[in-house]
UniProtKB/Swiss-Prot annotation:
<dbReference type="InterPro" id="IPR039428">
    <property type="entry name" value="NUOK/Mnh_C1-like"/>
</dbReference>
<keyword id="KW-1133">Transmembrane helix</keyword>
<keyword id="KW-1278">Translocase</keyword>
<comment type="similarity">
    <text>Belongs to the complex I subunit 4L family.</text>
</comment>
<protein>
    <recommendedName>
        <fullName>NADH-ubiquinone oxidoreductase chain 4L</fullName>
        <ecNumber>7.1.1.2</ecNumber>
    </recommendedName>
</protein>
<dbReference type="GO" id="GO:0008137">
    <property type="term" value="F:NADH dehydrogenase (ubiquinone) activity"/>
</dbReference>
<keyword id="KW-0812">Transmembrane</keyword>
<keyword id="KW-0520">NAD</keyword>
<feature type="transmembrane region" description="Helical">
    <location>
        <begin position="29"/>
        <end position="49"/>
    </location>
</feature>
<dbReference type="InterPro" id="IPR001133">
    <property type="entry name" value="NADH_UbQ_OxRdtase_chain4L/K"/>
</dbReference>
<keyword id="KW-0496">Mitochondrion</keyword>
<dbReference type="Pfam" id="PF00420">
    <property type="entry name" value="Oxidored_q2"/>
</dbReference>
<dbReference type="GO" id="GO:0045271">
    <property type="term" value="C:respiratory chain complex I"/>
</dbReference>
<keyword id="KW-0813">Transport</keyword>
<keyword id="KW-0999">Mitochondrion inner membrane</keyword>
<keyword id="KW-0679">Respiratory chain</keyword>
<dbReference type="GO" id="GO:0005743">
    <property type="term" value="C:mitochondrial inner membrane"/>
</dbReference>
Amino acid sequence: MPPIFANIILAFATAFLGTLIFRSHLMSSLLCLEGMMLSMFILSTLIILNMHLTVSFMMPILLLVFAACEAAIGLALLVMVSNTYGLDYIKNLNLLQC
């Protein structure tokens, strides 16, 4: 395994660990999810280029489209929660609260 793949997998693992540790704040979770998506994009691009898979050249672009949609929905949710409650705690997203 080349060192670049190990570094990207380490970046993904770090972002995933950050998601598990900082799961109480919505902004921290969104940043960690973006880090995971970025490392997945770079890893998929490198794998496709190294294996010369001409059929799958569109997959990293599709991953970026989904990452942009996830970021837009996450930021809209963050603005909604911040305006409603004044905080960005994930526990405020519980729909069963009275």
